[in-house]
Amino acid sequence: MDRPVAELDLTNASLYINRELSQLEFCHRVLAMARDPNLPLLERVRYLSITSGILDEFFEIRVAGVKQHATFGAIQRNADELSADELLKNIFAHTEILVAGLYATLNDDLIPALSKEKIRLLRSSDWSDEQRDWLKRYFSSQVAPIITPV
């Protein structure tokens, strides 16, 4: 059965998915796992952490590259026909929603649920003077030497 294959217009932008926007959609799906009350609480915390890590790396690598293209006035559009400036606007719009969802999930869902399980996250404003002093000493003796360039 030889049927003719429809010719595809490979210049049609609707055939392509932007790599950066696709990665943000993936972040939304991971965040949805953090919001799923049917999952164990610590798994939800883990998914939230994964979402945050993906976003950090996304901005360090992908957004930095798009910003470079925008800064140098790259006029070449991707196959999806977005310019670097248009892509940045899309990225920031998606990210604003994503970060708001991330913080809402943390503050409104996970922290209260953790608290019910007697797992408390202390904010720096809740630290005692003794805790603050210990942390300063620990940072100076253990962390700073590792992260300080030679």
Listing of model-derived features with the role each one plays in the protein:
Residues 1-150:
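N-terminal localization/anchoring segments of enzymes in phospholipid and broader phosphate metabolism
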